[in-house]
């Protein structure tokens, strides 16, 4: 028995003794409770709420299972905007804003996406990063479907490895001032 094997045997025994009284953790599913709505009559907050709600109105719950089966997930609103998708796939657009949907319910995720689109249009940000994660694949399957229904989404594609790979999406959002001049992306 050489020095190295003796050292590993001793450290292995010590490690087992140290973990002797531990028990295995049980991973449970977390159930979220409904959030109680506040009665807020402030006109500015109501306006912001209605804008965000208007954007989340486009997201329906119907599920078309055949729509986004290809991997990686990608979408363009119109074939004339194919150059935008091509540049997005090549990684030429860097997102200026990011949102993480981990741990949210479907309704909360829709509200968060509506808030993201509202913020992007107000701040004139055209590229966003949406992190939906893996989990039980509910948000992973629904997020591309919801985004494809929104009229202000120009294109989206699975994020590069640096931004989360298949657990995230990079989105190009149409800004109101860009509706007149869409050639900014060429």
From Swiss-Prot:
GO biological process: rescue of stalled ribosome
SMART domains in the record: SMR
GO molecular function, one term: RNA endonuclease activity
Key words of the record: Endonuclease, Hydrolase, Nuclease, RNA-binding, rRNA-binding
EC number from the UniProt entry: 3.1.-.-
Self-association state and partner proteins as the record states: Associates with collided ribosomes, but not with correctly translating polysomes.
Entry protein name: Ribosome rescue factor SmrB
Organism: Buchnera aphidicola subsp. Acyrthosiphon pisum (strain APS) (Acyrthosiphon pisum symbiotic bacterium)
